[in-house]
Amino acid sequence: MDVFEALYTTRAMRRVKEDPIPDNIIKSMIDSAIRAPSGSNRQNWKFLVVTDKNIREKLSNIYRETWDYYINSFLNSAKDPGASSLKKQDDKDIETIKRISNSASWLAENYHKVPLLVLALSRNDPTGSSIYPAIWNLMLAARGHGIGTC
């Protein structure tokens, strides 16, 4: 795949296949991630790879609880006429918000089915910004292997 095609067409894939990801592809994705640039070349990151079904289920419960809290807070703030969440949104914007929210809600309910979770952890960097290129490299590598990410 041409690099520009990947840059222009990669999107968040919240609905992914449940097929296991082979170890060699996981290693390729992580290898791509750790080659990313970082501030002062500190490479101040760790990646936690989770494929175990039981651990994914436990993380799924945490994710679902967090999503429920987030979406309920968002919806409650939207009810407040002075809130900025949905203030001055036209119908197209509201439809986009609903579509994204529905997709994210689906992921929250089906998170345990995602075959691979990669948790990107930043050490000693309160902004976390140095890890972003590494995550993007990982996502592009996944895309190169035909795997969706979000």
Predicted regions and their residues:
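A generic alpha-helix structural signal
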Residues: I26-I30, S60-Y63
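Specificity-determining recognition surfaces
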Residues: M1-S28, R42-Q43
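Glycine-rich, charged/polar anion/phosphate-binding loops
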Residues: D31-R35, N102-S105
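Short loop-to-beta-strand entry elements in the cores of soluble alpha/beta enzymes
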Residues: S40-T51
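Glycine/small-residue-rich phosphate/adenosyl-binding loop
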Residues: V49-I131
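Small-aliphatic-rich amphipathic alpha-helix that forms the alpha element of a beta-alpha
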Residues: S28-M29, A33-I34, L116-C150
